[in-house]
Amino acid sequence: MQLLTIGINHHTAPVALRERVAFPLEQIKPALVTFKNVFLGPQAPNTPEAAILSTCNRTELYCATDDRAAREGAVRWLSEYHRIPVDELAPHVYALPQSEAVRHAFRVASGLDSMVLGETQILGQMKDAVRTATEAGALGTYLNQLFQRTFAVAKEVRGTTEIGTQSVSMAAAAVRLAQRIFEKVSDQRVLFIGAGEMIELCATHFAAQGPRELVVANRTAERGQRLAERFNGRAMPLADLPTRMHEFDIIVSCTASTLPIIGLGAVERAVKARRHRPIFMVDLAVPRDIEPEVGKLKDVFLYTVDDLGAIVREGNASRQAAVAQAEAIIETRVQNFMQWLDTRSVVPVIRHMHTQADALRRAEVDKAQKLLARGDDPAAVLEALSQALTNKLIHGPTSALNRVNGADRDSLIDLMRGFYQHAPRSNDQSGH
């Protein structure tokens, strides 16, 4: 079985492409079934394994398969599933085999590959991906071991380095951008669309600025109400957004919608109602919540996750010592995992040896039982049984010794001595 990771992320693809390759949560389980069975070979000697990690900044397919064409098949499947031409998608895709796939998983979970260096949200997202793959029956020995090691490495990196300290989060970056547009955030009305973890983080940072008003609009009213109450804000129905958008100076959106929920026309009407006072908008969703054409409006300042990434990277540069320490830990753990992976290659051989030896044992025991039932002497039957087992079990090794010559024979002799530690050496003059 070979490990392989196929994916795109914020390093290789813009948000305009990432949003087209993202998987809504409810699609991941059925997608895993088709990915495994159709493209990773259901007739392979070993059952293929797969997991899908889909976040704002990355979509990745983790695989364990015997299929030598898995790389091409995975890219083709991703292209066909999302109806994106292969020629358009392929230049942005990375394919990481074996140790590269292991190293990548360790770095992702540790926050080293994130837009926000050292952020912890990705670890939870990866655990969710593993849970979903497990529920779909898509994980097996190889990926289970990979992800368990991945979580252990992430814990070690975060516990022994300062990779997560003093990081500039996406939420903090959004506040910094707002401060460039408005002299005082405390004078502004802020609307949050959604009620997930990212919106909660943003609300925390903006609430610390003491805005004039804080409002939460969410598809599930109760959840939006609970979040608003935490920050002494108000909740409003999401359906009221088109008619009330003009009331807000700052709008931050991050929902799980597969289509934009804020269109160009609605924003144009809001700008007109505001008499062209500026609106600061942050779209943290992938796929995007706000139509990109909105950013072309004169009085609208629209930023996406990629835009905020530039501010985040400014804070990343100061923690390179922690990065080097984390990379060293990861490299050691990658080597450890690859050693485990190497041992897995002998498992089929060992299993076959056990099966063959057991078949020989059963055959001789059956023969002995028939002799005993016939009334033969038990001692003679046991002697014959033991002699037959001995002869059959050493037949393979002795035949191999007789077939090889030269250096191969010397190597095989040394190997056999390791198996049968009491075997006499070739220079033994005892005559035995």
From Swiss-Prot:
Lineage: superkingdom: Bacteria
Swiss-Prot/TrEMBL catalytic activity: (S)-4-amino-5-oxopentanoate + tRNA(Glu) + NADP(+) = L-glutamyl-tRNA(Glu) + NADPH + H(+)
Protein name, UniProt field: Glutamyl-tRNA reductase
Organism the protein comes from: Burkholderia lata (strain ATCC 17760 / DSM 23089 / LMG 22485 / NCIMB 9086 / R18194 / 383)
Xref: PANTHER family: GLUTAMYL-TRNA REDUCTASE (PTHR43013:SF1)
Annotated function: Catalyzes the NADPH-dependent reduction of glutamyl-tRNA(Glu) to glutamate 1-semialdehyde (GSA).
Pathway recorded for this protein: Porphyrin-containing compound metabolism; protoporphyrin-IX biosynthesis; 5-aminolevulinate from L-glutamyl-tRNA(Glu): step 1/2
Keyword Methyltransferase listed: no
